[in-house]
Amino acid sequence: MRSFLKPLLTIAAMALGMTAVIPMPAWALVELNVNKGNVEPLPIAITDFQGGDALGAQISQIVTADLKRSGLFAPIDKSAFIEKISNPDAAPRFDDWKVINAQALVTGSVSKEADGRIRAQYRLWDTFAGQQMSGEQFFANDANQRRVAHIIADAIYERLTGEKGYFDTRVVFIDESGAKNARKKRLAIMDQDGANVRYLSDGRSIVLTPRFSPNRQEITYMSYESGQPRVYLLQIETGQRELVGNFPGMTFAPRFSPDGQKVIMSLLRDDGNSNIFAMDLRSRSTTRLTNSTAIDTSPSYSPDGSKVVFTSDRGGRAQIYVMGADGSGQTRISFGDGVYSTPVWSPRGDLIAFTKQTGGEFQIGVMKTDGSGERILSSGFQQEGPTWAPNGRVLMFFRDSNGGPKLVSVDLTGRNEQPIPTANFASDPAWSPLLE
């Protein structure tokens, strides 16, 4: 078979390459249709990657954990494996894998290059068709070992579902530590699985609602360091920050526009009314988008930037509204019982996630962009703040049920809810786009 090479991405100025070894035959059997509702998880066997001592097993463990956490895959316990893979480049004994109902098989290897880089490669096999589906290799420095595993998991996810994965991403959030009445809150960033936590602020001031820019290099957030809530821009890698305007009153809930050129937020005036404004980050000019005597807040752009979803209590209690990006055509779309908050548009453009408080419960749900088809994915005590994975298939939010908030993810079926491990309490998550 002919193979080809093309660039995949750059990590810390280290170019990684992707080599597709053998294309999937058109008649291969393994596939997951993630658009048909509830999907039975696909049984998949993921062997330890050969070589690299403990690193091969670690990469296998990370790939396994990523795929399992998605809810679409059911990794088979290694104790059930019949064949012990010794040469990951050779075709496996497919019958041995069919016996344990492994519909897909992942083999791989890790080695150290002469220049000190890690070389990791994998092969994905369709055991019932008896064919290789894909195979790729990656090079990285030691600092990016975990990223290589996430990239491999993304490649497998995409090959078997036809959609982009979301494992090579980061989450920015509020790390909370200390006693409840003296809680220290710090900006923090981590991999989507809870690893590689790094703190972006020192905890001397209260910080809230961090949000990623589309280029993944900046975040907006709120800080009370001046005594009043103000919106800041922070460069993640350099730590450089700047104040986004010095508005009278208080500013809340900042988010970037999809092109990264604007920040949309709500401003609370002395009269107690909160309205929505957009600021052009180049000219620093602001445009008022709502002008009501109510509380309008929590704005979020649609993926194409043409519309904005927000909440308003102009009808008596907080409901979800949609308007044009210029403030035109403000239309209520939610009509259910309860109080709605924190709406956020899916990266796919098809759904809006929200928090809903009703009957003493806090619910995380989704609805279509016209308000129809409302579905509740999770219910509990004091949970809120959904954020979308970049492929629009999973949500993350925070739940306060044992003395402090923790992060939780849930897929669109509502059946696959997963805790996200953090060393301390954690709130206000925001999911990054896929890294590059």
From Swiss-Prot:
Localization: Periplasm
Keywords: Cell cycle, Cell division, Periplasm, Signal
Signal peptide residue numbers: 1-28
Keyword Cell cycle carried by entry: yes
Keyword Endoplasmic reticulum: no
InterPro entries, alphabetized: 6-blade_b-propeller_TolB-like, PD40, Tol-Pal_TolB, TolB_N
Function comment: Part of the Tol-Pal system, which plays a role in outer membrane invagination during cell division and is important for maintaining outer membrane integrity.
Family: Belongs to the TolB family.
Protein name per the record: Tol-Pal system protein TolB
Gene: tolB
